[in-house]
Amino acid sequence: MGPNAVELTTDQAWCLADVLGAGSYPWVLAITPPYSDHSQRSAFLAAQSAELTRMGVVNSAGAVDPRVAQWITTVCRATQWLDLRFVSGPGDLLRGMVARRSEETVVALRNAQLVTFTAMDIGHQHALVPVLTAGLSGRKPARFDDFALPAAAGARADEQIRNGAPLAEVLEFLGVPPSARPLVESVFDGRRTYVEIVAGEHRDGHRVTTEVGVSIIDTPHGRILVHPTKAFDGEWISTFTPGSADAIAMAVERLTASLPSGSWFPDQPLTRDFDEDAATHREPVLQRRTQKA
């Protein structure tokens, strides 16, 4: 079996997509044209092709390695995908994408000016979890009582805290359980890394994406999963639970299943350890308090 990955500069990646006629890269990777004037294109392609030939990605006849060509095409023309944004500090952003096309799955990760394309065999929801958490801090699932908040209330709370409202008072007002407050405090004070996940697909010639996404947050106190559900009145509710691998797999399954094509793995239903659930699961407390003027 040959290599299943290639690391390129963003300029090289753009060059290959151009040469292959694969189209543009997804916005989440932010790989944009490296020249502002189209007259610079020929010189740019010549320089990049020479470097790619030295790397063995392009042969002496100018043909792109078929494996690399397939990976690039899968990312640029994905029929289903997960957009990933990993944040670990101010200005420290890792961009990623899980791209599916036919039977091919490719993971693209961009860090600064380097982007890696990796062909992967992902045939089950659980196989996605290591990919979705690759840019995090490797924390174990946190231990706290599940709780839920209207997404709009969480956004208002974030704004209040940024404007100087005491964090402890805001969390108490929201009804965050005492067992979860140290974790939530570490989220708001910046002691965390997290990934935001949004699902999408091409459907009838159009791009369709989920209205909301899933977040996985690593804090000094452990890993938190935040996943959305829609209330009967149409309001989005964010549920906070310990970030176990099973919980993450189920959350992403629900996210992809909300798109028109449904689940990515319809023949691989998720199973749960009901003994473990009975010992650890608590019904989330939904707080729907009215903001005082």
UniProtKB/Swiss-Prot annotation:
Family: Belongs to the EspG family.
Keyword terms, alphabetized: Chaperone, Cytoplasm
GO cellular component: cytoplasm
One protein family per Pfam: ESX-1_EspG
Protein name: ESX-3 secretion-associated protein EspG3
Knockout mutant characteristics: Deletion of the gene impairs iron-bound mycobactin utilization and EsxG and EsxH export.
Cellular compartments annotated: Cytoplasm
Matches recorded under InterPro entries: EspG (IPR025734)
Domain of life: Bacteria
